[in-house]
């Protein structure tokens, strides 16, 4: 058992680490250009913090022993932890642009023993900022992130949790949860066979199922519904967002509007979205996010609400997608200098010269030979590892062999 990681865990070897570090570094540079600052929150949180007032199922959380003050868990996502940190320590009501790179942990569904439990994400949160401009910034930043990574063939699936819930609220309360479940599972057959009180309710449920397609198609279908009050306002806001993103000239090239789609985490109150890429026979969910205007109140001492929005990018999915495209390095960075003593009397001089090279060339890799290999073996090793130069060192400094 000790020879392998536990089920659901895995090790990352140097090449994969280097590839994912490149992805992370490019994302952090993009976040920085947009004015976002990095925040680091605890991997370990109170379970009550992680479930976000019931918006996240406790079954998703890997829970630890009771500390004596309450149950603990490993974060299944970052938004709740960041919301808790910001609302208790950064509440000056000014827009806070925060970014992160971190691991998250999720219990696999029942019956999926051995399924991956640790994931890596990078993302941003824009807090204390409501309105269409903030939502547009999020979508445009997401687009910029994927563009900087060299991804062009991807699709943005955009929904609106608030609008979808408002439409669901027109159905009988006893059917709302079942209709939502059918729509989430894309089960049209079961949806059409539910015990509706009348044809009007059934037609509305089936129309909700069909609210996905191009922007023009979905807005046209919305126009045929009898929308009033809150629904009309939410549609106007959605149209304003779409217009602003289009007017920027830098929005996603392929946008699908899906008002039947709901995120698995229930704290979203406005726009929700996924970035998806299809490569060969694989479909990759590159990232997801949305607006959550009620979440921060869960952590405020007086339950005061503040707006928030953001997204997370899935490093594993990005990594697999970029591997298929062939845009990631296929080997680790080579050694630039292999520094070798000519004999035992040169050991001290070898260490000194290696350190001198590191100071002179801080971006270069300098490796020290630790002995036990002949000059011929060192030359063979250097060729196999694409070493830039072997430096031989005698007691008085570098020498030619």
Curated annotation (Swiss-Prot):
Swiss-Prot/TrEMBL keywords: Amino-acid biosynthesis, Cytoplasm, Histidine biosynthesis
Location of the protein in the cell: Cytoplasm
Signal peptide: none
Matching SUPFAM superfamilies: Class II aaRS ABD-related, Class II aaRS and biotin synthetases
Pathway in which the depicted protein is active: Amino-acid biosynthesis; L-histidine biosynthesis; L-histidine from 5-phospho-alpha-D-ribose 1-diphosphate: step 1/9
GO terms classed as biological process: histidyl-tRNA aminoacylation; L-histidine biosynthetic process
Coiled coil: none
UniProt-recorded Gene Ontology molecular function terms: histidine-tRNA ligase activity
UniProt GO cellular component terms: cytoplasm
One Pfam family named in its UniProt record: tRNA-synt_His
NCBIfam families reported for this sequence: hisZ_biosyn_reg (TIGR00443), PRK12292.2-3 (NF008940)
Subunit and interaction comment: Heteromultimer composed of HisG and HisZ subunits.
Protein function: Required for the first step of histidine biosynthesis. May allow the feedback regulation of ATP phosphoribosyltransferase activity by histidine.
Official protein name in the record: ATP phosphoribosyltransferase regulatory subunit
Provenance organism: Synechocystis sp. (strain ATCC 27184 / PCC 6803 / Kazusa)
Top-level taxonomy: Bacteria, Bacillati, Cyanobacteriota, Cyanophyceae, Synechococcales
Gene name linked to the record: hisZ
């Amino acid at each position: 058992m000790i020879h392998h990681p536990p089920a659901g865990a895995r090790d990352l070897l140097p090449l994969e680490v280097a590839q994912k570090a490149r992805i992370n570094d490019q994302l952090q540079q993009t976040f920085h250009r947009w004015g976002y600052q990095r925040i680091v929150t605890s991997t370990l949180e109170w379970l009550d913090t992680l479930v976000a007032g019931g918006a996240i199922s406790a079954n998703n959380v890997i829970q630890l022993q009771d500390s004596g003050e309450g149950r603990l868990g490993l974060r299944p996502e970052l938004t709740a932890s960041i919301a808790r940190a910001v609302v208790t320590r950064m509440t000056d009501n000014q827009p806070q642009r925060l970014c992160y790179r971190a691991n998250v942990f999720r219990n696999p569904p029942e019956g999926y023993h051995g399924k991956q439990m640790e994931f890596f994400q990078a993302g941003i949160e824009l807090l204390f900022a409501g309105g269409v401009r903030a939502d547009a910034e999020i979508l445009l930043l997401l687009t910029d992130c994927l563009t900087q990574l060299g991804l062009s063939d991807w699709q943005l699936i955009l929904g609106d949790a608030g609008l979808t819930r408002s439409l669901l609220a027109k159905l009988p309360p006893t059917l709302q949860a079942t209709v939502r479940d059918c729509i989430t599972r894309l089960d049209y057959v079961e949806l059409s066979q539910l015990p509706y009180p009348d044809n009007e309710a059934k037609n509305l449920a089936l129309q909700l199922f069909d609210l996905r397609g191009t922007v023009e198609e979905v807005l046209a279908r919305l126009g045929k519904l009898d929308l009033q009050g809150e629904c009309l306002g939410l549609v106007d806001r959605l149209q304003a967002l779409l217009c602003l993103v289009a007017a920027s000239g830098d929005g996603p090239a392929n946008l699908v509007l899906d008002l039947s789609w709901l995120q698995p985490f229930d704290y979203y109150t406005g726009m929700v979205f996924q970035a998806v890429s299809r490569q060969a026979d694989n479909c990759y969910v590159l990232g997801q996010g949305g607006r959550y205007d009620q979440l921060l109140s869960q952590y405020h001492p007086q339950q005061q609400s503040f707006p928030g929005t953001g997204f997370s990018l899935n490093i594993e999915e990005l990594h697999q997608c970029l591997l298929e495209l062939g845009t990631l390095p296929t080997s680790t960075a080579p050694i630039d200098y292999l520094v070798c003593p000519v004999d035992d009397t040169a050991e001290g001089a070898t260490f000194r010269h290696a350190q001198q090279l590191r100071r002179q060339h801080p971006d270069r890799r300098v490796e020290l030979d630790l002995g036990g290999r002949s000059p011929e073996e060192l030359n063979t090793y250097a060729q196999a590892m694409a070493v830039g130069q072997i430096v031989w060192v005698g007691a008085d400094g570098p020498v030619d062999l």
